[in-house]
A protein has these predicted regions:
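Leucine-rich tandem repeat or coiled-coil scaffolds
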Residues: 1-361
């Protein structure tokens, strides 16, 4: 089922029976009323952080709707996890579809950020419903679900909501620190995203992706409709096998600008060197790719030498930003490592450089 079409004609929809200038779906206090009512109806306590944001003076309705005004909900675990039920209450209020709700969908909602909210698969499915059915009425552009216990079922729902013919508004999807996602969840997500032509950023750091996630990621990258510019896979375990499987899709891709495979267990053995050869060729074939991060992969001298042609001036390398592990011998490190500093030159190795501590945002 595709997204609902807006009933707007040349402007904002007016509330039925309302005063002149009243705009349907742009009153945060009405949104708050819908949220608290539905929360009580399903037996969950309204989240104090959500309530505070909707009551803030900065978010009160204007006399006339402003086209630049947008709204972001940010929820963490300060008052306890939001949970699946709390997430359902929030998304139902966003859509304005719950029992006795007024005002319609909350049109100003553009960003949703849930940190350690433990929304789980059920919560992810309710967010997917907003993406799938919101259409022109709820145009979410940015979703950030950090450490929310999302697994394959939730990933499948998000992928389906973002497949061709469904959502066209979402630009960034961040699912960092969801280890229950794994390779299975990544494959489910990629099946939907491979036909998406609007998403620009996908972040899956520390989601326990294994080597078997490589084929799904590579297949997604190979689809011509895909317009993804940023793919962040830091902190997983793709290793040599996953890198090798991803490379053919990368070679055919014509949209990716930034790719992070930092801290993915790529080493210096024979299989690793062979995978790095394929990855090098893919980098040279992907004409849009300018930023690559391979930090914290101990590729060794053999692996480093394999990558050199991808950055050689005589090969007309387009790579502006290339990060490699600081444990490499200094000459090789300096031949490979480069940072895009907005016009500045290459920077040398820092003393004592090594793997940094993983931090949750």
């Amino acid at each position: 089922m595709g997204p609902k079409k807006s009933d707007k004609k040349g402007g904002k929809a007016k509330a039925k029976g309302g005063a002149d200038g009243e705009v349907l779906g742009e009153d945060p206090l009405q949104f708050l009323q819908n949220y608290t009512r539905f929360s009580k109806l399903i037996g969950v306590a309204p989240n104090p952080k959500v309530v505070a944001q909707l009551q803030s003076d900065e978010n009160q309705p204007l006399t006339q709707a402003s086209t630049w005004y947008t709204f972001t909900i940010v929820v963490d675990d300060e008052h306890g996890p939001l949970g699946p039920g709390g997430t359902r209450a929030l998304t139902t209020a966003i859509m304005g579809t719950g029992q006795d709700m007024r005002g319609g969908p909350y049109r100003l909602m553009k960003s949703l950020r849930l940190w350690r909210a433990r929304c789980g698969d059920e919560g992810a499915r309710s967010i997917a419903e907003v993406l799938r059915l919101g259409g022109a009425e709820v145009q979410l552009e940015y979703i950030e679900l950090f450490d929310d216990n999302i697994g394959p079922t939730g990933a499948l729902a998000l992928g389906q909501a973002l497949s061709i013919g469904c959502n066209k508004s979402l630009l960034s999807l961040k699912l960092d620190y969801n280890p229950s996602l794994g390779s299975e969840g990544t494959a489910s997500l990629c099946r939907g995203l491979r036909t998406n032509s609007s998403l620009k950023q996908l972040h899956l750091p520390y989601c326990d992706l294994g080597a078997d996630a490589g084929p799904a990621l590579g297949e997604m990258l190979s689809f011509t409709k895909l317009q993804l510019a940023v793919l962040n896979l830091q902190g997983n375990r793709l290793e040599a096998e996953g890198m090798k499987a991803l490379s053919p899709g990368l070679a055919r891709n014509r949209s990716l600008v930034y790719l992070s495979l930092a801290d993915n267990g790529v080493g210096s053995g024979d299989a690793d060197v062979a995978a790095l050869e394929d990855f090098r060729d893919a980098m040279m074939s992907c004409s849009t790719l300018t930023h690559v991060d391979l930090l914290y992969n101990r590729i060794g001298e053999r692996g480093a030498r394999v990558l050199l042609p991808a950055l050689a001036p005589e090969n007309k390398s387009q790579i502006k930003h290339f990060l490699v592990d600081a444990t490499l011998p200094t000459p090789l490190f300096e031949a490979l490592h480069r940072r895009d500093t907005g016009g500045g030159g290459k920077k040398g190795k820092k003393k004592g450089g090594g793997k940094g501590k993983k931090k949750k945002k």
